[in-house]
Structure formats: C-alpha cells, structure tokens
A protein has these predicted regions:
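Long, basic/Gly/Ser/Thr-rich N-terminal segments
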Residues: 1-47
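A short, gly/pro- and small-residue-rich
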Residues: 7-17, 188-200
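Conserved Switch II/interswitch segment of TRAFAC-class P-loop GTPases
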Residues: 179-181, 198-207
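Conserved active-site and cofactor/substrate-binding residues in soluble primary-metabolism enzymes
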Residues: 20, 24, 80-83, 92-96, ...
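ATP-dependent carboxylate-amine ligase catalytic core
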Residues: 106-194
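N-terminal pre-Walker A segment at the start of P-loop NTPase domains
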Residues: 46-69
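Walker A (P-loop) phosphate-binding motif
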Residues: 62-120
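Structural motif
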Residues: 84, 171-173, 203-205
Length: 207
C-alpha cells in the first residue's frame, strides 16, 4: 500500500534511512508504491534515550513497548463478549466500522475496550477508537512489536484479549489490520482454534 523495507544491521551517526510510515517506523526502503512517491529520508543523529531511574541522569537506549511479548501466553477472556473486525484489504473501512460500533455501544451505556492486533505500528486507529468512547485501548506496539507477522500475531492477540477483558468490560472490540490474506498474520489469528472459539462475532469489511 505504501512502502516496504527492512531493518539495517547497524546504523551510525550520519547514515541516511527512510521514514516508512506516518507512525514513525524507520528503515531501509526496498519498494515504493508509485502513487505515494518516494519516502522521506532521515539522517541519523544519535540514539533516543530513556531515563528509568528516578533522580538519576543515567540514560539507556529506548525500546519500543512496555511489556515483553510472551509467545506461550494462554487466552482467558473472562467471559467477556469479543467482536473482531477483519477486512479484505487495507483501507476497507475496518477502523470506521470499529469506531461506529464503539460509539453506538458507548451511547447505550456499555463499557467498551478496544485494541488493534495486526499491522505496522501506528497509534492513529486506537486513538480514533478512544475518541469514539473506548474506555481502554492497546496496540501491538505496546508489546515491542513494530510490524506483526504470522509468528507474532496469535500470541499478541491472546495477550491483548486476556489483558483487555480484565476489569470485565461489557464488550471488547479489536481490529485486524491489513487483509485476511495479507502478510501481517490475520489468517494465523483467525485460524487459531482457541481464538476462534473466543469470538462472539466477526465483522468483515469488504473493498
């Protein structure tokens, strides 16, 4: 849809890499959608630091995510109804549908939690769900995953379903970014027997 690329084996100050999406994913661009034009170049200035020790000016390299993904995570939805939104492709209207459902349920007084399980790191969609009325939200990036695959998608979904059903909301809604047959792991998620059994409804957006 836009750009695809890879992570360089190493970077140094002064190197030029590319901005691969509006969520700030950086890397070496391998292919370009002609409709989008060339990606922006970004020159490496240094490493982003975080300061985990209160009162100490000791910086350590920042990492994506505040949790480490457990590939052996066990699914527990705590009896909460689950609605999944999938699509035939990108830009099929999944987020718009999710936001409309969240808004309507919130209008009826229901507590709704929402998350995005697959895709490339970009908080825009879950922020839109929050704006629509979701009480809590999450995205796969919170677990250190910048781009999902079939290898990470099922474990991410189990983990987020378990976390987002804690506190017993009335319903959890989650979006599966990209298409069912795309490279981001949607097919693997929907094919997982335990995840499939946990779903109350699946809504398909077609384009």
């Amino acid at each position: 849809f836009g750009y695809s690329g890879h992570i360089p084996e190493q970077v140094a100050v002064g190197d030029v890499i590319q901005v691969l999406n509006i969520g700030g994913v950086l890397g070496i661009c391998d292919s370009v959608n002609p409709d989008r034009g060339q990606p922006f170049d970004a020159r490496v200035l240094g490493c982003v630091l975080q300061f985990p020790f209160l009162g100490e000016r000791i910086g350590v390299p920042a990492r994506v995510g505040y949790h480490r993904l457990d590939q052996a995570a066990v699914l527990d939805t705590h009896g909460v109804p689950i609605v999944a939104l999938a699509g035939t492709c990108m830009e099929a209207g999944k987020t718009a549908a999710a936001c409309a459902i969240v808004s309507r349920m919130r209008h009826r007084g229901l507590a709704v939690h929402a998350f995005k399980a697959t895709g490339v790191s970009l908080r825009r969609d879950i922020l839109a769900m929050e704006d629509a009325g979701a009480r809590r939200s999450q995205i796969f990036t919170d677990f250190g995953i910048v781009t999902t695959t079939a290898a990470s998608g099922p474990a991410l979904t189990r983990t987020m379903l378990t976390e987002m059903t804690q506190g017993k909301p009335d319903v959890v809604i989650f979006e599966l970014g990209d298409g069912i047959l795309g490279a981001y792991g949607v097919e693997a998620i929907l094919s997982a027997p335990d995840i499939a059994r946990s779903l109350t409804a699946v809504i398909l957006s077609a384009n």
